[in-house]
Amino acid sequence: MSEFEVNDFGEVVSNAEEMSGAELYADFLGKVEKPKDEFVYYYSKYLSVVNRLTGAATKLHFWLSLNSEVNTGRVFVQSMTQRGALDELKMTVGTYYKALNQLKELGLIKGESAVYYINPAYIWKGTADMRARFLKVYPRL
């Protein structure tokens, strides 16, 4: 059974218990210590895309990544959350949707309406071992 499944609502969920980064990277790096905290990782591939983003799209992408679920990259943007984001990012509704469309067009996020997924090839919030497992199961997210 995979550590990730798609539930009845089309959401990617993790059913993994304890994960060990050392299992995945032992052949390549030797012993790898698991970080004590969760991090938001920005991968070098992201640099090739970030220069093409507008300032609003960059701010929105950072906001979405920081507010995404750990180890899934899923972000819920309900109307209350959207209003909070607009206030926090100092954006108009029109600017928000233009930025959102640019993120989708460049493949940085996927999703519709209130549920989006951060593309783990660029940014990942969580542990590196869960990202590796996620990319193995969903290589084209």
Report each predicted region and the residues it spans.
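Short, amphipathic alpha-helical interaction segments positioned at domain boundaries
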Residues: W124-L141
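Short recognition helix of helix-turn-helix/winged-helix DNA-binding domains
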Residues: M1-V77
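Acidic/histidine-enriched, beta-strand-rich ligand/metal-binding domains
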Residues: T54-G55, L86, K104, M130-F134
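Intrinsically disordered, low-complexity segments enriched in small/polar residues
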Residues: E23, F39-Y41, G94, A114-V115, ...
